[in-house]
Regions:
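Alpha/beta-hydrolase active-site loop
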Residues: 168-189, 247-248
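Alpha/beta-hydrolase fold nucleophile elbow
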Residues: 115, 191-203
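Substrate-access "cap/lid" subdomains that shape
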Residues: 186, 220, 229-345, 374-397
Length: 507
């Protein structure tokens, strides 16, 4: 039987894609199992090389003839870590400069106006890509009748290095994401999508990027709703901090006060090697983040939310996993055998003279935890939970409806030591628990389909303009949180972290 590939007629030119059938068991009886049309590796901007390195993206030009869109484009230049290899079923890639592409999943390239969901991947602003197997959008498109888009954007030194003689540097990766959203506005109707119903969603650095977008005036109107998984508005960098990072990179390159033109002439591999040397020298786990004070991101996102000067979506869904930091602390040999005094010593960096009281509080909340797990719980709140609470408060004050969740299902990996760690919810959101790589992260757990379908459906409902669950109220002074789990603790919980918040000087 001769099956012709799907074709999309976009304003930039024609695209030839592939047809993909969904797979996996049906947990809740709503799976359509209809095939979807997939278009991969679509350029949304020119390759950021030469004078475009560190500069804002330049939109991709139109083309003539039929363009093949059957292969993912290369990732942004990077040195993948352990998690990225697991996410993609073990594949290792270092990427290429010509990386500014996106991918589209749709049930049909017709005249329907389906909701659109644009995924921004995580990876500490250093790694990742839109073609990772966990991010396959087939289930969203087939079951939820949404058009699913994943994107690549510049990472690390290429996306977030601040240079004094390049005024738009420091936010190039964020500008890439916004340019991809402009592409969606101009082209998504050709894939059966509605440019007026765009939901942007992401995890970790992807969610943190969305948090930054909430402070970008030029992003207003590019998306209507936002979903922020394990990231809020706290991960931005001042210009002074950014200058220090630039100096560290220049030291690693053996340069003093390098200009943008000098750095544009250095091979990408050499810049990556210098970046890796920076990481080995210690310091921040997020050495590159969007930089404040430029034309794209003039003020802190929380201030922009309060002032009404940023993107201002109509609604936000956001949350965390229960044990975020265990993804990192479970492998930390320095925590093996740590005692209470050791945790207090670490806590002084954040809490000063009150460190002992804070550690005592967390120990009383988690009496069965070992001291390493107590420390991990404190860091989970510091890095993820408290910023999520701050975001919820800012949105409530600004009159933007928001819903908060916690994902509490623990992976059995490493004998259960990782718990419900950072990133573990991703295959559940995409309903891809059977994708290659997911089993490495989820361990030998069985019967995950129902929880996966529930979480996927909540995201689909939200993209269609509804509350994520009929019994899940928007945030108010009672701080409702929806707990995702496959046991009897699942469902609505009111203000589950009131005691923890007390030691972070929040009400």
């Amino acid at each position: 039987m001769d099956v012709r590939p799907p074709v999309a007629h976009t304003p930039l030119g024609d695209l030839s894609g592939v047809t993909q059938a969904p797979g996996g068991p049906d947990a809740l009886g709503y799976r359509s199992n209809r095939p979807v049309e997939v278009f991969r590796g679509i350029p949304y901007a020119l390759a950021p090389v030469g004078p475009l390195r560190f500069a804002p993206p330049a939109p991709a030009p139109p083309w003539s003839g039929m363009r093949m869109a059957d292969q993912f484009g290369p990732m942004a230049p990077q040195i993948p870590g352990l998690l990225e290899s697991m996410l993609d079923g073990g594949r290792v890639a270092v990427g290429e400069d010509n990386c500014l592409t996106l991918n589209v999943w749709t049930s049909a390239c017709d005249q329907e106006k389906r909701p659109v969901m644009v995924w921004i991947h995580g990876g500490a602003f250093l790694t990742g890509g839109g073609g990772v197997s966990w991010y396959d959008g087939t289930r969203f498109a087939s079951d939820g009748d949404v058009v699913l888009v994943t994107i690549n954007y510049r990472l690390g030194v290429f996306g977030f290095l601040h240079l004094e003689d390049a005024p738009d540097s420091g936010t190039a990766g964020l500008a890439d994401q916004i340019e991809a959203l402009r592409w969606v506005q101009n082209n998504i109707a050709a894939f059966g999508g509605d440019p007026n119903r765009v939901t942007v969603f992401g995890e970790s650095a992807g969610a943190m990027s969305i948090g930054s977008m909430l402070g970008v005036p030029s992003a207003r109107g590019l998306f209507r709703r936002a979903v922020m998984q394990s990231g809020a508005c706290a991960n931005v960098m001042s210009r002074e901090q950014a200058k220090q990072r630039t100096a560290q990179l220049c030291d690693a390159l053996g340069l003093a006060n390098a200009t943008a033109d000098q750095l544009r002439n250095i091979p990408a591999a050499d810049l990556l090697a210098a970046q890796q040397q920076m990481l080995r020298s210690g310091g921040s786990a997020l050495p590159f983040q969007p930089v404040l004070g430029g034309s794209l991101l003039p003020v802190h996102p929380l201030k922009a939310i309060n002032d009404g000067t940023g993107a201002r979506p109509e609604a936000v869904l956001h949350g965390t996993t229960l044990d975020e930091m265990r993804l990192f602390t479970a492998w930390d040999t320095s925590l093996a055998g740590i005692d209470g005094d050791g945790v207090v010593s670490r806590a002084r960096a954040r809490h000063g003279d009150t460190a002992h009281d804070v550690v005592d509080l967390y120990r009383s909340i988690h009496p069965t935890f070992d001291w390493g797990q107590v420390w991990s719980s404190m860091e989970t709140d510091a890095v993820f939970r408290i910023p999520a609470h701050d975001l919820g408060d800012a949105l409530m004050t600004a009159g933007v409806p928001s819903w908060q969740y916690v994902f509490a299902w623990p992976t059995p990996l490493l004998g259960g030591r990782m718990g419900a760690c950072h990133a573990v919810e991703i295959p559940f959101v995409f309903n891809n628990v059977h994708q290659p790589g997911a089993s490495q992260f989820l361990g030998a757990a069985q019967h995950l389909e129902e929880l996966s379908a529930q979480m996927n459906w909540a995201w689909i409902r939200f993209a269609h303009g509804d509350a994520p669950h009929p019994q899940w109220p928007a945030e108010d002074e009672t701080h409702p949180v929806w707990r995702f789990h496959n046991d009897d603790t699942a469902g609505l919980v009111l203000d589950p972290y009131v005691r923890e918040r007390s030691c972070w000087h929040h009400s």
